[in-house]
Structure formats: C-alpha cells, structure tokens
Regions:
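Beta-strand-rich domain onsets/edges
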Residues: 1-27, 42-44, 50
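Broad gene-expression machinery/nucleic-acid interaction feature
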Residues: 14, 83-85, 110
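Conserved, single-site charged/polar hotspot
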Residues: 2-8, 29-31, 51, 57-63, ...
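Short, ordered, surface-exposed loop/turn motifs in non-cytosolic proteins
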Residues: 22-47, 54, 347, 351
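A short, solvent-exposed loop/turn motif at the edges and junctions
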Residues: 67-99
C-alpha cells in the first residue's frame, strides 16, 4: 500500500528497478524495498517491497510526485520531482542502498542496478545528486565550438566514431577523482536525465540529446583530455563538461530517444569534427549562441521540430550527421607498437579495457592491469 507524500497537490510517476550481476546477467528474486527519504515526519518506513522476475525486473509501481506543471514552468521554485530511496538485497551480493532516486510525473523512471559479489558484510551507498535544473552547479566555462587540431603535438582521430565506452572522470580534470568506464549510450542517457526533464516535448528531448552527444563526440574526436596528459574521455564537472551522476536513474522517454539517435551528432559545412555544442539552463545562466534548456522546452511546446530548435540557437548552417560505430575506446596511435615487451600507461589502459570486456564476456580470461605487455596480455 502506498503512503501519501506530505505535499499538497500530487501527480503520479512510475518506477521500475532492473537488477543484474557484474556480467550483466539478470538476477531473479532480488529483494527491492522502496521508501521515502527519512524526515522528522516520515521515519523512512517502506512503502513498497518487491522481487525481481526472471528478467531481473520488478513490476512497475506508481509513486506520488509533485504536479506535472512544476517541471514545465521555468519560473517554478518547487522541486518538480519526488525523491525515493531504494534498497536491493541479494544473497551473496553486497547490499545496494540508493538514495534520492528521482521520480517525475507522467514518466517511467528506470533504476538499473549492477550487483557486486559480497566480500564480508559490505554495503554500497549511492547518493544521487540533485538535478541541474533544480540545484545550482558551476557555470560552463566557454570554449571555442571548433577545436584547432593543427597545433603542434595535437593528435585527433582520423574519423568521427561512436565509441563503445567513454571514460568519465568524476570531478574536475585535475581532481583526484575516480574514473568510470561507461558505455556511450548509458553515458548519454545519464547526462540527459541529469540535465533536462523527461516530461518535456519529444522534439525538445531530441534537440538536447543531440547537443549532449555532439559535445561528447567532440571530446572523443579531438582527444581533448588525452592531449592534455589525462587518460579519460570527459569529466562530470558542469564547469568543464556535462553533469554525469554515478548510479543515478534514467527515464524511459530519454532512454528511447537515445536508443533511436545515438549515432548522430551536429555538424557545420566543411568541418569534420563534431561541434562542441555548449548549452545552459537559460534561467539562472544566459548563453547567447548556445542552446537554452528552458528555452528549448518552450519552443517544443510551441510545436517546433528538433532541427528547428537546434537552428534557433546554433544557426541555420547546423545540420545532423551520422557517425560510424566501433568497439572499445577510440584512441590514436600512442607512438609505439603495443606488443610483447611494451610497457607503460597505454599498455595498462589497454589491459583495463580488456579486463572490462572480460567481466561481461566471461569466456574471456581476466587480465591483470600491470602495464607490462606479456604473454598473458597477448593471449587475450
């Protein structure tokens, strides 16, 4: 039985939890408990107890949310989504506690959880940061939308490609933060769910997803951070890149858009690289010649199409292009062959990538990332 939220007007949103193991295989009979965040009024009592089916999925449950108009009105100051906490328990695996899962009205929220084998009595606690349109984050530092790739020492890819994985540095570039290997589509879905509301018009979601993907592919194509001496693709800092939140839920409307257009990006005539399409909320921060997130919502509600929204902000010479799809994490030649006897950071990076694949495809032996190219690495 659902417990009513302590708010006035209410709408309803939906939540489904998907549970897999480290090899991405579904886990059946996982125990999933949903509760409201603990307050003085609400002592964190469970409102739903569920179990996953053979596909590792719970049934879809209805949950209370704020009114729909909160997420469609840029002048609204109230939080437009509801927060819930989720606990996932599976015998032999670490317990997962995910706090502040976001539920929007008239939207299906998807919480994907990958369980890890238990070592002792470990528990992983994940706190999802607030949405960028509700909380305040550092403003984007402006950059040129087309990077000069002809400077001495600069290395770029030979073509525009869709990587299988991106490496996300969870902080500012120079911070001592953790790096995460994330599939490209999962990264885009995470960022879009963190940067815009899933309740917005379809054309608005598509326009924003295109801007997010083009920005990301510019970082991939120019090897922006690699050329600065880093071994990651992009950061989670809004001052430098885009907001990515470890462990957060995504939304079905965004999930479907990304699956349909994930191989697209934004181009200008006679420019090979994807355009670094910068954007801002358009409310707390204004950004001439960048996409305004709230402004794009208003245009979508007026009936503007995806490309019309894009060109309204970036100009009439912006068009949609399609990239190739490749496996792994694209990188240019490091200056030496990676073969028996080679060593160093690039060998270690390759070993880490091989080990990431081996964790999913269990027929492939695991490899130790020691930075030395030996026979064990050659056999993979």
């Amino acid at each position: 039985m659902l417990i009513k939220m302590q708010v006035g007007e209410q709408d309803r949103g939906e939540l489904q939890v998907n549970v897999t193991d480290s090899d991405n295989a579904p886990i059946r009979d996982a125990r999933v408990t949903i509760s409201e965040p603990e307050t003085a009024i609400n002592p964190n009592s469970p409102i739903e107890r569920l179990e996953t089916d053979v596909s590792g999925q719970t049934q879809i449950v209805d949950l209370n949310t704020p009114p729909l108009e909160y997420s469609l009105n840029e002048n609204n100051e109230n939080m437009p989504y509801a927060n819930y906490n989720i606990q996932i328990e599976v015998p032999g695996y670490e317990t997962e506690n995910i706090r502040n899962v976001e539920i929007l009205p008239d939207s299906l929220s998807l919480q994907n959880v990958r369980m890890r084998k238990r070592e002792g009595e470990q528990v992983e606690n994940i706190d999802i940061d607030p949405h960028t349109l509700y909380a305040e984050y550092p403003e984007k530092i402006p950059e040129d939308e087309i990077k000069d790739v002809n400077e001495p020492g600069e290395i770029v890819l030979s073509r525009v490609v869709i990587p299988e994985y991106v490496v996300v540095h969870d902080g500012t570039p120079s911070s001592n933060a953790r790096d995460y290997y994330v599939t490209y589509k999962d990264y885009i879905k995470n960022v879009a769910s963190s940067e815009i509301y899933a309740t917005w018009p379809r054309a608005t979601i598509e326009a924003n997803v295109l801007a997010i993907m083009s920005f990301t592919l510019n970082r991939v194509y120019t090897e922006w951070y690699r050329n600065k001496g880093y071994d990651f693709t992009i950061t989670s800092s809004t001052a430098y890149d885009q907001k990515w939140i470890y462990g957060r839920n995504i939304f079905q409307s965004i999930d479907e858009v990304v699956d349909e257009i994930f191989d697209q990006y934004l181009s200008r005539p006679d420019v090979r690289q994807p355009i670094l399409t910068q954007y801002c909320d358009g409310k707390r921060v204004t950004c001439p010649n960048w996409l305004s997130q709230w402004g794009s919502c208003n245009l979508g509600e007026q009936g503007f199409g995806t490309l019309e929204i894009i060109r309204n902000y970036y100009g009439d010479d912006m068009y949609i292009n399609t990239a190739e799809q490749i496996s792994g994490i694209p990188a240019s030649w490091p200056g030496y062959d990676l073969t028996i006897g080679a060593s160093g950071q690039k060998v270690m990076q390759m070993q880490e990538q091989l080990d990431t694949i081996a964790r999913v495809y269990t027929a492939i032996p695991r490899v130790s990332a020691d930075g030395v190219f030996g026979e064990g690495t050659q056999l993979r």
